[in-house]
Each structure stands twice: as C-alpha cells, then as structure tokens.
C-alpha cells in the first residue's frame, strides 16, 4: 500500500486524537495519505508517489450531505477534519495541483450506502471533475462495487466496494479482495459470495 485516503465519515470516530494517531501510524509505515488533517491546509495537500520517474498525485474529498454520509467534521483554517467535497473546493484543488504532477487522481467518499449504482448527481460531478483536468476518479463509501466507466478517455470507478470490512448485516457485501493465502483471518469473520439484491414483488 502506497497511498490511502482519510477523507471519510469514520476517520474522526475517535476525535482529533484518533485522527492524529492514524496519521502517525501511517507515517511510521511510510504510507502517504490525503483528505484529512489538522487544518484545511493539510487536508488539501495531495499525496504524491513516483513510479519510474512519473509523479502521481492524489487528492481526496468527503461528501458533505447528511443523507449520504451523515455528520462529518470538515477542516477549517484552525480546526481538524476532512476535505469537503464541494465543487468549488475540488475545482480549485485540481487547478492548483494539475500542472505540478504528471498525473492527478481524485478519491471521492460519496454515494448511497448499499447501492449498486451511482446517483445522477454523482455522474454529473464526475464529468465536471474530469473536465477540470483530473486523470481519473476512485470512489468509495457505498459498501458495494459500482460501475466502472470510461469518459473523456479516462476512468471513473464510482465505488470499489469493500476491500476488508466487518459488516453487521446478514447479507454481507462481497469484498473486492479474495485472499487465498497470507493473512490469518481466523479471528476476523468475513464472507465470500455474490452481491445480494433484494427484489420485492
């Protein structure tokens, strides 16, 4: 793992102290992160990695709507929190960073939980983000894998689903990752399987 997004509705579950500790642990492991911090300046900083001389920057934003992600503390000049997924904020961040790196990707924590499809507002915003100059979009939050589409010769992953997640529901979403060997998961319940879609007649 080289880069993670901290812009999500659980990064502040243990308050500012918890966020600070998360950042410290990631620093120790050498994992770059973006989307959250002790103030708005930190949250808007990209996580940058270089492969074969190519610089790749990541910016991360968390949705602000109560009906999708619930309460999320957003960072201000003097307050810790998340990077807010407002159009103006995203556009300005892309314009500020686009010319400094070879590629710029956007993490978005958005969407309706347990839905297999993006909302119209998601597709509209995604199109704008690519027009503003981002090279691709990687989404999460829905606990379901949502469509991958190509637009402007760039890719939009609306939601990657669950990589590794302790779900409390009986009909658990399938994980994105299927371990065949390696990690000992004997003490951590998880489920394989296909997505379950309830159909009412």
Name what the model sees in each region.
Residues 23, 46, 90-95, 126, ...:
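Generic structural signal for well-ordered alpha-helices
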Residues 11-23, 40-45, 64-69, 111-116, ...:
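Active-site environment of divalent metal-dependent phosphoester hydrolases
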Residues 50-104, 124:
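Binuclear metal-dependent hydrolase catalytic cores centered on His/Asp/Glu-rich metal-binding motifs
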Residues 2-7, 13, 32-35, 56-60, ...:
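Structural recognition of the beta-strand scaffold that forms the well-ordered cores
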């Amino acid at each position: 793992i080289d880069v993670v997004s901290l812009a999500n509705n659980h990064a502040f579950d243990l308050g500012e102290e918890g966020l600070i500790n998360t950042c410290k642990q990631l620093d120790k492991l050498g994992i770059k992160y973006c989307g959250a911090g002790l103030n708005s300046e930190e949250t808007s900083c990209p996580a940058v990695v270089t492969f074969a001389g190519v610089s790749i920057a990541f910016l991360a934003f968390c949705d602000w709507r109560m009906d999708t992600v619930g309460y999320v503390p957003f960072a201000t000049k003097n307050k810790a929190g998340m990077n807010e997924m407002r159009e103006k904020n995203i556009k300005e961040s892309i314009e500020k960073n686009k010319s400094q790196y070879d590629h710029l990707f956007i993490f978005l924590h958005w969407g309706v939980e347990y839905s297999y499809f993006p909302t119209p507002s998601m597709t509209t915003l995604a199109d704008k983000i690519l027009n503003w100059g981002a090279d691709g979009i990687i989404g999460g939050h829905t606990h379901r894998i949502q469509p991958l589409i190509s637009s402007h010769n760039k890719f939009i992953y609306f939601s990657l689903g669950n990589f590794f997640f302790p779900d409390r529901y009986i009909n658990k979403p399938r994980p994105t990752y299927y371990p065949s060997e390696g990690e000992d998961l004997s003490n951590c319940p998880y489920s394989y399987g296909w997505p379950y879609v309830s159909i009412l007649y």
